[in-house]
Amino acid sequence: MKRVCIIPCGAKKIWDVHPEAGSQPANLVYLSPLHQRTKSYAQTFFSDWLIISAKHGFLKADEIIHENYDVAFGTPHADQITREALRQQFHEKHLTAYDELVILGGKKYRKVIDPLLLPHQTAIYPLAPYKGIGYMLQALKQAVETKVELPPHI
């Protein structure tokens, strides 16, 4: 079974700490604790992983982000990626080739990811049972430290 991990971006970005940073690869842009922990989890358990951004859509680690932004799924914003553009990226970035997508985000991502899935695909949300970011951070840390993946949750 071919799997990919999708991790959330995060509100805190490199330009919030270093305004002079200029353009940066996506894997260096996002600084929030949840993003850092999900990235560590993705790098530990998956050979393929992407970041999902409400502005840029699906990002590979080496894709360049040029400037700060404040756009989130679930909050209307003129700069939010359209469903059509996200669907196009889903195909262009070959996410259709995966059988299982492991989404390390909260329930708001179901509305974004699930409509993109093809019949052969399943989306797993291992953080869904956790009530709050603190519990999510703890679970992710323990999973990485023990090298045991979080149980699947559909």
Show where each model-derived region lies:
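Peripheral peptide segments
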Residues: M1-I154
